[in-house]
UniProtKB/Swiss-Prot annotation:
Gene3D superfamilies cross-referenced by the UniProt entry: Glutamine Phosphoribosylpyrophosphate, subunit 1, domain 1
Function of the molecule: Protease subunit of a proteasome-like degradation complex believed to be a general protein degrading machinery.
Ways its activity is controlled: Allosterically activated by HslU binding.
Record's subcellular location: Cytoplasm
HAMAP family assigned: HslV
GO-annotated cellular components: HslUV protease complex; proteasome core complex
Protein name: ATP-dependent protease subunit HslV
Disulfide bond residue pairs: none
SUPFAM superfamilies associated with the record: N-terminal nucleophile aminohydrolases (Ntn hydrolases)
Domain of life: Bacteria
């Protein structure tokens, strides 16, 4: 069976603002199946931003589990992320899920992986997915050399990634916490 490919999710933090955006392309093999997928969402009454890279069904399962952890831990992002990662690593069914999450609140940005890792990247930039390294490079250059707001850095960086990565398009979803 062919694998779903694609996605670029980027989160940038500057000052009291964090923005997260993602493209809308879903690819099966060398065919674009959907160009308008929504891979970035608000969770926990709009206080948490979350984006996914990987299998769509797997990601929705993880979103559901992550929201349950947020409810259980009163919106504590770090604790919820660690608890989800523990479950993901130890639960036989969850271990088969092929996705990665990028999550952020007003204080912290994290990557949660299926290996049980919870990572807080440096410089306030989180990038995942096939176009993640392109978007991360662009975001870092813009963050270090301009005064652009996170929203604008994410938009411009996703445009650049969309021009380079064949699994990334320019149909973005963007969410901001200020």
């Amino acid at each position: 069976m062919e694998q779903y490919h694609g996605t670029t999710i980027l989160s940038v933090r500057r000052g009291n603002s964090v923005a997260m955006g993602g493209d809308g392309q879903v690819t099966l093999g060398n065919i674009v199946i959907k160009a308008t997928a929504r891979k970035v969402r608000r969770l926990y009454n709009g206080r948490i931003l979350a984006g996914f890279a990987g299998g769509t069904a797997d990601a929705f399962t993880l979103f559901e589990r992550f929201e349950a952890k947020l409810d259980k831990h009163q919106g504590n992002l770090l604790r919820s992320a660690v608890e989800l990662a523990k479950d993901w690593r130890s639960d036989r069914a969850l271990r088969r899920l092929e996705a990665m999450l990028s999550v952020a609140d007003r204080e912290v940005s994290l990557i949660i992986t299926g290996n049980g890792d919870v990572l807080e990247p440096e410089q306030g930039i989180v990038a995942i997915g096939s176009g993640g390294s392109y978007a991360q490079s662009a975001a870092r250059a813009l963050l270090e050399n301009t005064e652009l707001a996170p929203r604008d850095i994410v938009t411009k960086s996703l445009e650049i990634a969309g021009d380079i990565c064949i699994y990334t398009n320019r149909n973005f979803t963007l969410e901001v916490l200020e």
